[in-house]
Amino acid sequence: MLTKNINFKNFKLKKKKLNLKKKFLSIINDENQVINSLTNYYRNSYSKKFVKKYKKTSNFRVIGMGGSTLGTQTIYNFLKDKIRKNFIFIDNLQTQKNKNENKNFTNLIISKSGNTIETVANAHIYIKKKDKNIFLTENKNNELYYLAKKLKSEIIHHNNFIGGRYSVLSEVGMLPAELMGLNASKFRQLNSLIKNKNFVNALLLNVSSTIDLIKKKKI
């Protein structure tokens, strides 16, 4: 065949990819606080000393909704074989009480706004007198902040610029991960990933394909 040794290039697709790459690099190089939370430059609002206080604690209960708990649940389920701690997740009002409920727990109550109705309700349902409690919420007047003050509990600041769905590599996901005995810096790998050309090219190709499908109303 005459075309056997001819390589065809889709210049339209190449131009799209180039424009997308420029936008990607612009976002990466910009001082974006959410992007920063994916890197090892991010500074947690809790200390290693704080984590060590709970080193001998075996039972944890995570109370929250949606993005406040899903990331932590994913980490726990994926790495369960390496984790020697017991974590229970309360993420709706229908959650059945576990057979271990007679044990003492350290509760992690998570809500950015501090006013999520289900989280506030479950906090009142599950917190017992002998439990230790850690609240992750914004440092402002809200229902969980008031409850934490009333119980004289630990309060970890939830940065207001990170929404629930983007929060897994912030305090919301990394504090529970460190309480599991995992290392937060092992998760924040954006610094090294953006230096990997294969990763960046695959990412851009996937994003470009997704955008095209959305424009064509196929997804």
Regions of interest found by a model, annotated:
Residues 10-13, 94-95, 209, 215:
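Low-complexity, compositionally biased segments
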Residues 47-58, 99-104, 207-217:
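Glycine-rich phosphate/diphosphate-binding loops that line cofactor/substrate pockets in enzymes
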Residues 2-4, 31-34, 84-86, 151-152, ...:
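Generic structural motif recognizing short loop/turn segments at the entrances and edges of beta-strands
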Residues 18-23, 141-144, 155-156, 202-205:
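Short, functional N-terminal and low-complexity linear motifs
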Residues 40-41, 50, 182-188, 196-219:
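Acidic catalytic cores of enzymes that act on phosphate-bearing nucleotides/polynucleotides
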Residues 1-46, 51:
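Extended, charge-enriched "interface" segments that sit outside catalytic cores
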Residues 55-197:
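Glycine-rich phosphate-binding loops that contact phosphosugars or nucleotide phosphates
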